[in-house]
Design a protein with these regions (language model features):
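Bacterial N-terminal signal peptides that target proteins for export
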Residues: 1-15
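Formylglycine-dependent sulfatase
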Residues: 3, 16-432, 440-461, 468, ...
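A contiguous binding-surface segment within folded domains or other stable secondary-structure elements
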Residues: 435
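A glycine-rich phosphate-binding loop feature that marks nucleotide/adenosyl-phosphate handling sites
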Residues: 479-483
Length: 512
């Protein structure tokens, strides 16, 4: 039987077409399977929660049953650190996977510029339902990177808009009760999500940010039971201040429990990575905005039933900039060159090999001007204060607290010990070095001791190398304070909404 070339060619073409269709179908099924198996993500972010102010991290005096339950079902990170102890710069760093000086949002209230990439937009591009609820604090350019944004009113947590030198000390309160928690839309957003898509939720609380209300908890914390660090005075007013702070943590914990319950109701818990952390330390002097552990250490808890061993603890160093590449890796995506953090997925699997040897943090303008940097390894911390002529004034909300007023009173009476006076010290040491094993509260600066000269030189060199890697630039002028450091009154420099970094440069307020 003769074989015709035309027949052979036509048959081959049909086979190729069939093969192509089959492969396309198979690849489509494979991609569909990958999408179906991609985990969901829920990030719950506290506002001004100290790392050791929940039960799972050692403070059993605070009522946090839901966070304790989350910890018992997931992994606690005992050495997790933020890149900044200031609200918006810390959040920008988490989302961009970059250090504050790389984001152009390193000062408080500076919005994230449109040019910056944030990891939720990669998830949205891949078909995730990406939504945020609660405190926003990211700037207008980031809204379109989310499918839905439900921002709570935070006007009651700052002085009146555009208040300046003539303003009084009154707050413009516009919410009360649970609405002040910043969490009232968390569960609603989870219920109203697109059920046909994997989801990423950024749930940002306002609790336990100041100012505080009385009687917000059905089970108020007794002032006599609060745990005070040695750098705060032990007086009745300070204890009452801490008790109100504990009450707000308890309210936050209640909303965390509601989210966890809703995930169970939706049968989504098993395939959802739940991440809990705080944006900076507690809103007290020498905590929030400081580079001590009380400012930059965060109570990171991650639960993922399919992978993470329940009630496990990780003692390796982790930085907030590592969260973005880790989430992207868990979703099956490469991080890309803009993310400078390191994925720690291996730690979630229980592997103990360290992913980093040190963490780095920045202190920049937050109500008051300052510029300090820190390097921390497992045992030692090095801090360099570039504006050592200025005192380490607490942020304005902490400076208005009963705790700081007590510190001021005791200092005026000559009764405030040296260990509680660092907020008033000017000039400060140019360099600080602490042995965290021997001095966990960082009260004894050993930078000038010859016995620690090698450690000081090593960490100083690490800081200089970090500056080169991040291409950090030294500002040519200082940013004006928005409050008087003695009276706490607003200055003419206070403008709301605060200008972006670029506008401040254009207006000559700062020089980069």
């Amino acid at each position: 039987m003769p074989v015709y070339p035309f027949f052979i060619a036509r048959t081959a073409a049909h086979l190729a077409l069939i093969s192509s269709i089959f492969c396309s179908y198979a690849n489509g099924e494979q991609e569909h399977g990958r999408k179906a198996n991609r985990p969901n993500f829920v990030v719950m972010l506290a506002d001004d929660l100290g790392w050791n102010d929940i039960g799972a991290f050692g403070n059993t005096k605070v009522h946090t049953p839901n966070l304790n339950k989350l910890a018992s079902e997931g992994m606690c990170f005992d050495q997790a650190f933020l890149t900044s102890s200031s609200c918006s710069p810390s959040r920008a760093s988490i989302l961009t996977g970059r250090y504050p000086n790389q984001t152009d949002a390193e000062q408080l209230h500076w919005p994230i510029p449109e040019s910056q990439k944030i990891f939720p937009e990669r998830l949205k591009l891949a078909g995730y339902f990406v939504a945020a609820a609660g405190k926003w604090h990211l700037g207008e350019a980031m809204r379109e990177r989310f499918s839905v944004v439900r921002e709570v009113d935070t006007s009651g947590f700052q002085l009146p808009a555009n208040s300046g030198v003539g303003a009084n000390d009154k707050f413009a309160e516009s919410s009360s009760g649970d609405d002040r928690s910043g969490c009232s839309e968390w569960v609603n957003l989870l219920r109203e999500r697109d059920s046909q898509k994997p989801f990423f939720l950024w749930l940002a609380a306002v609790d336990p940010h100041r100012p505080y209300e009385d009687k917000i908890s059905a089970r108020p914390h007794p002032p006599e039971e609060v745990l005070l660090p040695p750098y705060h005075p032990d007086t009745d007013l300070v204890r009452q201040d801490y008790a109100r702070y504990y009450d707000e943590i308890h309210r936050l914990d209640r909303f965390v429990g509601m989210v966890l319950d809703e995930l169970e109701i939706q049968k989504a818990a098993d395939n959802t990575v739940v991440i809990f952390l705080s944006d900076n330390g507690r809103p007290f002097p020498r905590d929030k905005t400081s580079l001590y552990d009380s400012g930059i250490r965060t109570p990171l808890i991650i639960r993922w039933p399919s992978t993470i061993k329940p009630a496990s603890r990780c003692r390796q160093l982790v930085s907030a900039i590592d969260i973005a590449p880790t989430i992207l890796a868990l979703a099956g995506f490469p991080a890309g060159p803009s993310y400078v953090g390191k994925s720690f997925t291996s730690l979630l699997e229980g592997k103990e090999a360290p992913t980093r040897d040190a963490v780095f943090a920045e202190k920049n303008w937050h109500d008051y001007e300052d510029r300090s940097r820190a390097v921390r390894d497992h045992r030692f911390k090095y801090i360099v204060n570039h504006y050592a002529d200025l005192p380490a004034t607490p942020p304005a909300d902490a400076a208005r607290s009963d705790t700081f007023k007590e510190m001021q009173r005791l200092r005026a009476e000559g009764l405030l010990p040296e260990t509680q006076s660092s907020c008033f010290l000017a000039p400060r040491p140019r360099e600080e070095l602490y042995d965290l094993k021997e001095d966990p509260h960082e009260l004894r600066n050993i930078a000038g001791l010859p016995a620690h000269g090698d450690t000081l030189a090593r960490l100083r060199a690490e800081y200089r190398q970090w500056r080169v890697r991040t291409r950090e630039k030294t500002p040519r002028m200082r940013t004006p304070d928005e409050f008087d450091r003695v009276t706490g009154k607003p200055t003419p420099a206070r403008i709301r909404p605060r200008w972006s970094k670029q506008k401040m440069i254009e207006e000559g307020v700062i020089l980069p």
